[in-house]
Each structure stands twice: as C-alpha cells, then as structure tokens.
C-alpha cells in the first residue's frame, strides 16, 4: 500500500536568537501512527513558497493547532488584546494555501487554528474570545489540570445529518475535547457546518464542492487518536483520501 506524504503546517517561532519553522510532535505522530503517512513540514515562507512544487510532492495537507491566533485584519475584526499571540508568517503562508490546495484536489484536514484558518480563507470571521460572547460557554481548557485533564472530553458535538463526519460513525452526538478561546463567528462562503456544540458554536466544517476530502474541526482528534474510535475514524478517512490521491499520481 502506498504510504502517503503528508505536508504539515508549521508555526514561525523565535527561540533565543533564531527563528524556527516548527510543528507539534502529536500531529507528526498522528500522521505516522493513525494513517501510516510520511510527514514533512511546510515552512512558513509566505509568497516565497513554491505552492506548485508543494502540491506535486504531497498527497495531503494537515493544518495544525497553535498557540497563536489568526491576525484579525484578515477577517475585518477589531484589534486583538496586546497579550494575544499572532503568527504573521503562518497567516501569509496558510491562508492562501488553503483555496489553492482545494482547487487542485489535495486532501486537506484542518485542526483548531487550522480550522479557523479554513473559515477565514473563505471570507468567514472569528470570535476572538468565545467565553465573552453572550450565550456561549467557556471553551478554554482548565489550566490547573495536567495535560490529560486539559485534553479530556469537555462537551458534546451534534453532527450534521448526512455530513462528512456523520458518515464515519453511527452516533449523532459525540464527546470531544475543548482547548480553544477563539471560534467561528460568521461561516465562510461555500462552507458547510459538520458539527455544533450545545451552545451553537460551530465545531466542524467542510468545503462544499471540494474535489477531495476537505474537513476542519475545532477540537483535537490527534490527541490519543489511537484510543478514541471517533478520532481514529476521522484520520482513517483523511488517510484513505490521501492514499487514493497518491495512487492517482503514479
């Protein structure tokens, strides 16, 4: 069986005197263990990135979560609080990458910040602080808990009937983790809701009329993916799409 090459988004971070293009180990492990893929990192080169070369190389793209948030001018939002972390290099690399990848049929799976990037890339907007929005619950993790506690199931999501996610399980409602404080406000153009939280917050989206797998989720299915059947089913579906895309390139 073909081992698909999966491009993983990175964050542009400065440590000491130098900048690094880096990605979380849990995403790399999920690509290897949950879908049998070969991970490579996509550097945040903005307009210097050769998208055509990237798309001819990879069989799928995984957009990761991050400690940074999309800079709000990309969705006509108000200025962020001074304590908010942004990553302008990632914004400039990934926001244009998403529609380009979808248009050429590259399978795309977006998680957390990646999910929010997907919405913004299609002219959607974000809540900068979900917990301050009337009627919305607090979706942030409990930082007093250990890592297992922070990533434990936090709330349910209701799946859209006949949607991408609903086809992966017999359940209409499942429990997911929640470690975010930004979230989708206005849904982007050409996007479809795949799951919502009890407070109505959009938790998963897909791209209508995409040529291939194009899904984004707010939660973190890469966390303990081999232990949670629903999370594994999502990576399995992404993996099948990537393997099929790789086979077509032979």
Mark where each language-model region is.
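Short basic/aromatic active-site micro-motif
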Residues: 178
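The feature captures the ABC ATPase H-loop/switch
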Residues: 115
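N-terminal beta1-alpha1 cap of cysteine-dependent amidohydrolase-like domains
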Residues: 1-109, 120, 127, 131-168, ...
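Catalytic cores of DNA base-excision repair glycosylases
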Residues: 170-175
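Conserved G/P- and acidic residue-centered "switch" motifs that form tight phosphate/ATP-binding loops
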Residues: 112
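Active-site-proximal beta-strand elements of phosphoester/diester hydrolases
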Residues: 215-218
């Amino acid at each position: 069986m073909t081992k698909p090459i999966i491009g993983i988004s990175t964050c542009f971070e400065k440590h000491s005197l130098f900048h690094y293009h880096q990605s979380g180990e849990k995403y790399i492990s999920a690509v290897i263990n949950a879908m049998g893929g070969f991970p490579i990192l996509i550097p945040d080169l903005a307009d210097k990135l050769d998208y055509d070369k990237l798309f001819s190389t990879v069989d799928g793209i995984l957009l990761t979560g991050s400690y940074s948030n999309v800079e709000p001018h990309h969705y006509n939002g108000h200025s962020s609080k001074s304590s908010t972390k942004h990553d302008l290099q990632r914004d400039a690399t990934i926001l244009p990458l998403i529609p380009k990848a979808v248009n050429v049929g590259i399978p795309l799976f977006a998680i957390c910040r990646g999910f929010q990037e997907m919405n913004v890339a299609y002219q959607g907007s974000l809540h900068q602080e979900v917990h301050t929005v009337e009627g919305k619950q607090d979706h942030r993790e409990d930082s007093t808990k250990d890592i297992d506690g922070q990533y434990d199931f936090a709330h349910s999501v209701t799946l859209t009937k006949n949607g991408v996610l609903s086809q992966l399980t017999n359940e209409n409602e499942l429990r997911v983790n929640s470690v975010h404080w930004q979230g989708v406000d206005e849904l982007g153009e050409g996007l479809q809701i795949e799951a919502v939280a009890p407070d109505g917050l959009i938790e998963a989206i897909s791209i209508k009329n995409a040529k291939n797998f194009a899904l984004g989720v707010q939660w973190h299915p890469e966390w303990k993916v081999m232990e949670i059947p629903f999370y594994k089913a999502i990576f399995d579906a992404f993996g099948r799409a990537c393997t099929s895309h790789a086979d077509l390139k032979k």
